[in-house]
């Protein structure tokens, strides 16, 4: 029997976050990089509560990093925005590599300046896995063809290098929206680049191009970078109860389109509900991950059997008035619904409308 530890990761614990962007300028283009950074500074200065520092390596002056300190929710809102894409655009033509690292601040010594939040109240327990998602839409009417293309490709090689491994890839659709989730042990960006280079994956991506609502040209680095930046949907919360894995465990994705401006609040609500549910050993949801980008919220749940046996817990609306709170944040019309689910029957109906169609779920063999 497979067992797993209790794990919990969240962007909603109120702690401050240190963001470090490692920059490798193209050879002999350092001055262009500095000029591009000067352009960025003006835009960064216009973002409330944001400042950054440009640092140059003492050992290797060609290596740079840009650091900034945030509260996690406003950072996630900004990094997923069109304004962020425009802000970093000047860097794209003069750097070979950009790598972003994000850390919650756990301990602090000294310092008396104002802060945007507190410290992490407890050290998080992780499982060595990074979770990420991509989402995009295809042209209406092409859904069946897209599902066929996505279901038919050969899985890429799981091992990226000695320290990075692609553990699981799952694809879902809801109407004309595609969601691809990945679990990676090690370096997420290295794994994504590894997957993108695989011939079978490139063939699928090319076959998808005519069906996409947003145009992209994968032979143009800037076009490809912009597409995947807009498609990125980071995990804002993950919790797993741990212990022996129940028999018949299945993964579902639930789609929660939020009302304008309510995406972060909806993701926060679901995250808190999942933390509560994880403390109940008899609950049906053994693990849950919330992904959010603007008004798009997707929640992965692992449940044994049929989630309709307990639709309230499966949807994350257990507890007093939680269904009403969800209804205020959810764009019910986008799911073909009106009003909060006030009965188990209505909760089952919401679950049916929110449940995404599984296209493929591939796990790498255990090493």
Swiss-Prot record:
<dbReference type="InterPro" id="IPR007575">
    <property type="entry name" value="SchA_CurD-like"/>
</dbReference>
<comment type="pathway">
    <text>Antibiotic biosynthesis; curamycin biosynthesis.</text>
</comment>
<dbReference type="InterPro" id="IPR007138">
    <property type="entry name" value="ABM_dom"/>
</dbReference>
<keyword id="KW-0045">Antibiotic biosynthesis</keyword>
<feature type="domain" description="ABM">
    <location>
        <begin position="15"/>
        <end position="106"/>
    </location>
</feature>
<comment type="similarity">
    <text>Belongs to the SchA/CurD family.</text>
</comment>
<dbReference type="Pfam" id="PF03992">
    <property type="entry name" value="ABM"/>
</dbReference>
<protein>
    <recommendedName>
        <fullName>Polyketide synthase CurD</fullName>
    </recommendedName>
</protein>
<dbReference type="InterPro" id="IPR011008">
    <property type="entry name" value="Dimeric_a/b-barrel"/>
</dbReference>
<dbReference type="GO" id="GO:0017000">
    <property type="term" value="P:antibiotic biosynthetic process"/>
</dbReference>
<dbReference type="Pfam" id="PF04486">
    <property type="entry name" value="SchA_CurD"/>
</dbReference>
